[in-house]
């Protein structure tokens, strides 16, 4: 038993490659590397007769930190080399690919953790959410931010001065490489693709409105139909959201400057951000729209029946067109909703107009139900005495109906078709004794009647009549 243990220990102690680095001192001859890989690393090695190559590949990889300098060209030269080829050099981890261009994927992995010189937890870009809506100024701001955020060298922003968002989204990788180096083109194109595919996963427009409600530029964007959003850094979304929602008093321009200049001027960003005690809080300054000014002209025009008797819905619009009637009926917003604050008074006035002194709200409400199917108004559920006009349905109801098409009528100028017009109910039947065709000349083969050449003459071609409708003057031979 003891001899077996000694023999096993001797075998293990001979194979030093299991315990020492594969890139150790040159006197180690038994390394578990193939002949091709050893020649690539410039080391003399031989194949181990005891342990096959598959056993070496199945060994769990171990992280080895080499305490010596090595040539980077010899480390990263084979696909069989270890995954971690970093060496300790002067107290700093130096990668073997420092002098080789780094790809975008590895660069973004390193950029996932903010560098030590970052003093803020977010990078905000205040541009429209859809990059295709960017103006040339938005494109310039985005490029300036990307240069500061990713440290992009040799980016000439003037080359992009005539490019807006729509043209920017149409640019390919070759188009970017014509304006900036290949490495910068990869980063810009990837970030643009990210903005287009995943816009604002944690921020909504309501959050931005609460944070920027006092901004004059935001009010202009509301009036012009634009949308303004904030793009924080993807690694710190919750903190960025908290900062934005807890500082609604921060003005738009100061927030923009502090977010875009904090990377290059960390000390100035602290100075530009005012404290909450210095910025006065103001009330929401959104203008309150007057429904009587907006809906007044429309209700006055629709309430005038012109000629004829006024209908109930027109009478209600007549009352709503005058703000002095708000004690009994008033608008609820600008979407056509209204409420009868005193329904009995409204019913009494309607009874006076129609000379019905017994009119009350129950009769009035039953009359209003008739307009539901006509798409003139609807009942607002959950609210008493509240209704809503459908102005689109009213416009459809007021359109004049077109007259009946003439293609279903026979020409009225034909003398032998007078019986059809005398008896409209027999339009589809042949007269029992049609008169003879009029002949206007002495010749029997006169010019054909214009009816047979008219475009409406062939409406019913090849009409087959049942036997019961054959003329009675025909003989039995037929």
Curated annotation (Swiss-Prot):
Tissue expression: Expressed in mesoderm- and, to a lesser extent, in ectoderm-derived tissues.
Top-level division of the source organism's lineage: Eukaryota
Xref: PROSITE patterns: ETS_DOMAIN_1, ETS_DOMAIN_2, ETS_DOMAIN_3, PNT
Positions with biased composition (Polar residues): 34-47, 259-280
Keywords for the protein's UniProt record, in alphabetical order: Activator, DNA-binding, Nucleus, Transcription, Transcription regulation
Region annotation Disordered: where it falls in the sequence: 34-56, 73-93, 242-303
A GO term from the CC aspect: nucleus
GO molecular function: DNA-binding transcription factor activity, RNA polymerase II-specific; sequence-specific DNA binding
DNA-binding residue intervals: 310-390
Location (main, coarse): nucleus
Pfam families xref list: Ets, SAM_PNT
GO BP terms, alphabetized: cell differentiation; regulation of transcription by RNA polymerase II
Residue ranges that the Swiss-Prot or TrEMBL entry lists as coiled coil: none
Sequence ranges assigned to domain PNT in this UniProt record: 113-199
InterPro entries (alphabetical): Ets_dom, ETS_fam, Pointed_dom, SAM, SAM/pointed_sf, WH-like_DNA-bd_sf, WH_DNA-bd_sf
Localization (cell): Nucleus
Protein family according to the UniProt entry: Belongs to the ETS family.
PANTHER family, alphabetized: ETS, TRANSCRIPTIONAL REGULATOR ERG
General function of this protein: Acts as a transcriptional activator.
Protein name per UniProt: Transcriptional regulator Erg
